[in-house]
């Protein structure tokens, strides 16, 4: 958590925090490399679940296409899976210290973002967590039995 917070606070490219920020950003990239990919895989699996509110096929397609559409190697992993699952276009230009910074979009612009998407993404996240818990319990069971 400390590494992530440090990256969020000073990891951006800024003359004042250049050396400290670069260290925080690179450390965050290393520490979160595997968890970001596991989380994206769980989100894609969750999107294939029951109901028609998510698209597992599009989650996988957008993940493959847009997972590196961010300066950090980890940030767009789950964002791409989520954008595809919900048929949304996320990210894009951002404002830092009053300046607009051009950034790539993640996902296809198939529909506008709406308030109900907060509920939808929470369902997707809960499904992802349950799948992750089941996989951990199965791994624990296998290790315990063998």
Model region roles, listed by residue range:
Residues 1-146:
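Hydrophobic alpha-helical transmembrane segments
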């Amino acid at each position: 958590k400390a590494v992530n917070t440090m990256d969020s606070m000073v990891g951006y490219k800024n003359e004042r925090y250049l050396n400290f920020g670069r260290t925080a950003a690179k450390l965050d990239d290393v520490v979160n490399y595997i968890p970001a990919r596991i989380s994206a895989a769980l989100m894609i699996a969750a999107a294939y679940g029951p109901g028609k509110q998510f698209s597992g096929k599009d989650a996988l397609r957008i993940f493959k296409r847009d997972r590196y559409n961010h300066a950090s190697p980890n940030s767009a992993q789950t964002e791409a899976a989520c954008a595809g699952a919900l048929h949304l276009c996320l990210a894009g230009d951002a404002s830092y210290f009053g300046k607009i910074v051009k950034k790539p979009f993640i996902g296809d612009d198939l529909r506008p973002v709406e308030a109900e998407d907060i509920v939808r993404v929470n369902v997707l996240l809960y499904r992802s967590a349950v799948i992750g818990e089941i996989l951990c319990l199965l791994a624990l069971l296998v290790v315990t039995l063998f």
